[in-house]
Amino acid sequence: MRIVNENLCNNEISIVIGKGALSALEELKDKKVALFYSQKIDPSRVKSHLKSFIEIPIIDGEGAKDIQYALKLVKLLFENGFDRGDYVIALGGGTVTDVVGFVASIYMRGINLINIPTTLLGMVDAAIGGKTGVNFENVKNVLGTFYQPTMIISDLNFLETLPLEEIKKGLAEVIKYGLVLDKDLYDYLAMNKEKIFAKDESALEEIIYKSSVDKFSVVKADERETKGIRIVLNFGHTIGHAIEAGSNFTVPHGYAISVGMVCEAKMAEEVGYAEEGVVEDVTWILSQYELPLTVDSLNAKIDVKKAIDAITKDKKVRGGYVMMPFPTRIGDWKRVDVPIETLKGFAEQCLR
């Protein structure tokens, strides 16, 4: 088991990684807890570690992120007499951590939050970083806060029954860290595909640990995205989000990001920021893990107009330019402000 202890803005944050990591909940035995969980998940494994708690299932899908639904969750905390010394647990995937994190951040200006992701994607990305968000007027994540959990528990037991396809979707984000932040992680991935696909305990623990440390190092340096550092976490996401939007969100996030990383690496090489061979390194590692490289391989209809429109509305747009992290070599990156018309041209080539 690995434990990462970090300090962010005078707040202590612990990340517990490994089989049996849920044992970290024992310290809540004497605490009052609200357990929010996805309806798709059996919460009994978590409940066995708690004593005084209420359980609140979260509806599936984007409806859970509606602001009115979030306020209903706030009301449940209020009606059950929760105060700032009590705890909220978010058990599930990105939707659950998004909405429950938002609720925790606004209730009494902040109540203790523990994230327990149940997918590889959640363990290496969604549960880390403190971003929360709910939808408003049919716009995704237009309301949100930066609010750090006191603890993140990544228990590998949740991954035992996860289909390999779900593991692959999470691996896209792991590969991202290796490509732009961590050559050691890239090398580890290059040598350990069989172990990772076999869900070897030590291999999964290693990639989750390295990914968690990589992401948290970026978050510590630029928690609120004001210094242009946290932008590195968006490698592959500008084109990737456009693909998601153009498919009416039928393409899974991990697959969209995989194609997005290929497109953005090609762009970086073509405009002269990436060393020769970077695109080959990107495509090789993604293909090793059986991730899609092109839009055609997604087996989904992409509305190019809708995808391009999503790029123009990207939150990274500033004064006609899009802030993008380009890989310069494996494990390194550079921020480049790309004219939006240039980006749209590259994107159209990639999406057709």
UniProtKB/Swiss-Prot annotation:
Swiss-Prot/TrEMBL cofactor(s): NAD(+); Co(2+); Zn(2+)
Primary location group: cytoplasm
Catalysed conversion reaction: 7-phospho-2-dehydro-3-deoxy-D-arabino-heptonate = 3-dehydroquinate + phosphate
Chain sites annotated for binding NAD(+): D60, G61, E62, G63, A64, K65, T118, T119, K131, K140, F158, L159, E160, T161
Molecular functions (GO terms): 3-dehydroquinate synthase activity; metal ion binding; nucleotide binding
Alphabetical list of Gene3D superfamilies matching this protein: 3.40.50.1970, Dehydroquinate synthase-like - alpha domain (1.20.1090.10)
Domain of life from the UniProt record: Archaea
Membrane keyword on record: no
Pathway entry: Metabolic intermediate biosynthesis; chorismate biosynthesis; chorismate from D-erythrose 4-phosphate and phosphoenolpyruvate: step 2/7
HAMAP family: DHQ_synthase
Protein name: 3-dehydroquinate synthase
Name of the gene this protein is made from: aroB
